[in-house]
């Protein structure tokens, strides 16, 4: 039998690195769940929302499977606001869109370091995750929401206290109130409040609620029926 160059005769196959083992295990679990699902719609929704709220394996390959399992799957049959909160606060999303390094220019950490605001998560949340393109938000809204997001980060697992958790680090946070889409947000509670407002907006309903139905070959049909979907979305608290 032909032998690979440099391979020792009779030597056992080497295991892939641990991150690759994790992603292979997560992928197998994902496909097994889809293959054995009694109701296929749930798996279709998991795949749809994982694509809508996509992250990259380039930043941390070992987190991708956990992200879908922890942030997406538990919420596909629940409120969009809860799904959005879980997604935007997951370590995989914070790493992917660089919010772990974002800090306000006037924050304690920002004044003392040559680092500053990162708008990636704020822009993606408004443009792709909730309101959609050409929905009326401005660059000022993106910048101010990025300031709201400062301080919300993830501590690496080796940290002795709260390691691996989504936490608020005040020394990174831009002080003061921020106005986003005409609404004023005050300091620390602003993140959850802003996400709730975005998720319940008419633009978010139009941008996100119809997409799963289009994917599943169910046609919304008339504008009146489409309006019913939008109204139902908002009445349910998104």
Predicted regions and their residues:
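N-terminal accessory alpha/beta regions
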Residues: 1-75, 107
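Active-site substrate-binding loop specific to GH73 endo-beta-N-acetylglucosaminidase modules
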Residues: 5-13, 63-238
């Amino acid at each position: 039998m032909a032998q690979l160059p440099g391979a020792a005769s009779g030597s056992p196959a080497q295991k892939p690195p641990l991150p690759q083992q994790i992603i292979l295990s997560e992928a197998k679990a994902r496909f097994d769940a889809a293959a054995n699902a009694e109701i296929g719609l749930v798996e279709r929704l998991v795949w749809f929302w994982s694509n809508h709220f996509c992250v990259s394996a380039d930043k941390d390959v070992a987190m991708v499977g956990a992200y879908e399992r922890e942030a997406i799957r538990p919420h596909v049959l629940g409120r969009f606001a809860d799904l959005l909160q879980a997604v935007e606060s997951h370590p995989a999303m914070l790493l992917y869109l660089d919010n772990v390094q974002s800090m306000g220019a006037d924050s304690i950490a920002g004044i003392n370091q040559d680092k500053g605001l990162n708008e990636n998560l704020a822009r993606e949340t408004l443009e792709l995750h909730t309101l959609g393109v050409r929905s009326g938000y401005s660059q000022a809204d993106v910048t101010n929401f990025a300031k709201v997001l400062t301080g919300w980060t993830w501590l690496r697992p080796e940290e002795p206290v709260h390691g691996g958790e989504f936490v608020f680090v005040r020394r990174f946070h831009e002080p003061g109130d921020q106005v986003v889409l005409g609404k004023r947000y005050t300091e620390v509670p602003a993140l959850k409040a802003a996400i709730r407002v975005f998720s319940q907006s008419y633009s978010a309903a139009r941008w996100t609620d119809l997409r799963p139905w289009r994917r599943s070959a169910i046609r919304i049909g008339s504008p009146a029926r489409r309006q019913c979907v939008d109204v139902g979305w908002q009445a349910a608290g998104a």
